[in-house]
UniProtKB/Swiss-Prot annotation:
InterPro entries attached to this UniProt entry: Tdp1 (IPR010347)
Organism whose genome encodes this protein: Rattus norvegicus
Region (Interaction with DNA): 401-404
Protein name: Tyrosyl-DNA phosphodiesterase 1
Function of the molecule: DNA repair enzyme that can remove a variety of covalent adducts from DNA through hydrolysis of a 3'-phosphodiester bond, giving rise to DNA with a free 3' phosphate. Catalyzes the hydrolysis of dead-end complexes between DNA and the topoisomerase I active site tyrosine residue. Hydrolyzes 3'-phosphoglycolates on protruding 3' ends on DNA double-strand breaks due to DNA damage by radiation and free radicals. Acts on blunt-ended double-strand DNA breaks and on single-stranded DNA.
Length: 609
């Protein structure tokens, strides 16, 4: 689709107006002839967003950077410094407009995939990367690297009482080993060291079934696996085709009756001979999400079975068992009844986090408090500490995609949503809503360009131009991605977190890790003059509250992977605090426009279509 605005005319691949990650049917590649990475499909074999398809295409068929003017339009333009890379979303007339439009390419001719000639402004690292094996070989090498991903680290040390939060990051290929020493790959989670697997359920948005099966240890690969998905029509048929060769895989389709909803929840239910474990995380079940991205994981304790005669409900002080059961019941899906029964048979009393889920529907009365941001509001009103008198504690939101939030901040972000984030036990002592700073962390173009993956990392940041140009009011809230504390500044975030830090960012009132991006579809939006909450998608996360750990507040851990010299109650925030506001030249990453002014870390440009 072609779209014209004050920013110029662009060819748009898909609409982003209502939701961040819309499922699209995947069709087999019909391309022929030699390709960069021959034998690899131009499109992923799994259902995914248009943004991820563009990233996949550019990884196997990159457009090399050339610092001549041959790829730029022949018109006089003011040149910006490198900091000014990317889309200009300012109303100022003297800001530079984008360099290349689809309109200016010869009709029917794709951008030339030029041979890369290193220039003076290309780093040594970029030159070295250009001499490395093709992407398909690098992918294979990385997979082999992860065959023994847990070696060199004692998983039992990671799961002991020294880590009361059981909050982890995924391993990242290409960073210093010390930053992976207490991180987890999916193979670690599915390892026999965690338990003798009987069966498992995988709730997710994107599935690469062949890849997923290989992540299980060989001795567990024929154990029953239930895939809970939201695919419809062609995408559903594709997933069924992927699963067909595996007799042990069954599928459960989550009902999505409201337009633009997705099954975005990412959870594993792992039944062992020794008990049950719940894993709530932020990664799709595809290789890319476990390779060079920042992702979050919460691991439950190993829940023991409740034996007959042991008169216990197995409930925790956080009501986790009842809330997880209610979440699964909301699917109204017969295949999940077996898992509901399994949960009832286990003792979840050691759980110290609260479950926050979203399920599609329109909720009124007390049902409004069960899901989405009203669920968060209810829990904070019951348990969140108030700020000391005279202190104004900000709120932080960090996410990988953004939905359509309305024509101004008053329509949702700084009204109902912020009101939920600001909820506390003692309402009378809080400053006015407008006085509380709101820091939103979302990667800039420069963050993506200099990342480990380069521009294709932006395929997992599907903020589209159609949405962005309607809500320029949002962008002054944006802060850069920076994660020196965890060694992940160059591993683009797919994790989503929300928290309430102290004014000096040394303490936390609460911390949430979730699948929910910054969108009304994920969190819900009020209708009928506030009488009804409408949610489109399935989401799931866990809330850490100090009171559940016998504390007033959490202290922020200085270094995510530091030794146990810090107090046990120090919470490991995975990125740097305080967040750094975008500079005047920074622009939010927008996936469906080109970036051609400077190469990424692989010497490539970004031409998404």
């Amino acid at each position: 689709m072609s779209q014209e605005s004050s920013y110029g005319k662009w060819t748009i691949s898909s609409s982003d107006d209502s939701e961040d990650e819309k499922p699209k049917p995947v069709k087999p590649s019909t391309s022929s002839g030699p390709q960069a990475g021959q034998g690899v499909s131009k499109e992923p074999t799994y259902t995914c967003s248009e943004a991820r398809k563009a990233a996949h295409k550019r990884q196997i068929s990159p457009v090399k950077f050339n610092n001549t003017d041959s790829v730029l339009p022949h018109k006089k333009q003011k040149m910006d410094s490198p900091e000014g890379l990317g889309w200009c979303l300012s109303s100022s007339d003297d800001e530079q407009q984008p360099d290349v439009t689809q309109q200016e390419q010869p009709k029917g001719v794709p951008p030339q995939e030029k041979k890369y000639a290193p220039s003076a402004n290309v780093t040594t690292a970029q030159k070295v990367e250009d001499r490395s094996p093709p992407d398909s070989h690098r992918a294979q090498r990385a997979d082999e690297e992860y065959e023994t991903s847990g070696e060199g680290q004692d998983i039992w040390d990671m799961l002991d009482k020294e880590n009361p939060f059981q909050f982890y990051l995924t391993r990242v290929s290409g960073i210093k080993a010390k930053y992976n020493s207490k991180a987890l790959h999916i193979k670690d989670i599915l390892s026999p060291l965690f338990g003798t697997l009987v069966s498992s359920a995988q709730f997710n948005y994107c599935f690469d079934v062949n890849w997923l099966i290989k992540q299980y240890p060989p001795e567990f690969r024929k154990k029953p696996i239930l895939l809970v998905h939201g695919d419809k029509r062609e995408a559903k048929a594709d997933l069924h085709a992927q699963a067909k060769p595996y007799a042990n895989i069954s599928l459960c389709q989550a009902k999505l009756d409201i337009a633009f909803g997705t099954h975005h929840t990412k959870m594993m239910l792992l039944l062992y001979e020794e008990g049950l474990r719940v894993v709530i995380h932020t990664s799709n079940l595809i290789r890319e999400d476990w390779h060079q991205k920042t992702q979050g994981i919460w691991l439950s304790p190993l829940y023991p079975r409740i034996y007959q005669g042991n008169h216990t409900s197995g409930e925790s002080s956080t009501h986790f068992k009842a809330d997880l059961t209610s979440y699964l019941m909301a699917y109204n899906a017969p295949p999940l009844q077996e898992w509901i029964d399994i949960i009832q048979e286990h003792d979840l009393s050691e759980t110290n986090v609260y479950l926050i889920g979203s399920t599609p529907g329109r909720f009124q009365g007390s049902h409004k408090d069960n899901w989405g941001h009203f669920r968060l509001r209810k829990l904070l009103q019951a348990h969140a500490p108030s700020a000391p008198r005279g202190e104004c504690w900000p709120v932080v939101g960090q996410f990988s995609s953004i939905g359509s939030l309305g024509p101004d901040e008053s329509k949702w972000l700084c009204s109902e949503f912020k009101e939920s984030l600001l909820a506390v036990r003692e309402e009378g002592r809080t400053p006015g809503r407008s006085a509380v700073p709101l820091h939103l962390i979302y990667p800039s173009v420069e963050n993506v360009r200099t990342s480990l993956e380069g521009y294709p990392a932006g395929g997992s940041l599907p903020y589209g131009i159609q949405t962005a140009e309607k809500q320029r009011w949002l962008h002054p809230y944006f802060h850069k991605w920076s994660a020196e504390t965890s060694g992940r500044s160059n591993a683009m975030p797919h994790i989503k977190t929300y928290m309430r830090p102290s004014p000096d960012f040394s303490k936390l009132a609460w911390f949430l890790v979730t699948s929910a991006n910054l969108s009304k579809a994920a969190w819900g939006a009020l209708e009928k003059n506030g009488a009804q909450l409408m949610i489109r998608s399935y989401e799931l996360g866990v809330l850490f509250l100090p009171s559940a750990f016998g504390l007033d507040t959490f202290k922020v851990k200085q270094k995510f992977f530091s030794s146990s010299s810090e107090p046990m109650a120090s919470f490991p925030v995975p990125y740097d605090l305080p967040p750094e506001l975008y500079g005047s030249k920074d622009r939010p990453w927008i996936w469906n426009i080109p970036y051609v002014k400077a190469p990424d870390t692989h010497g490539n440009m970004w031409v998404p279509s």
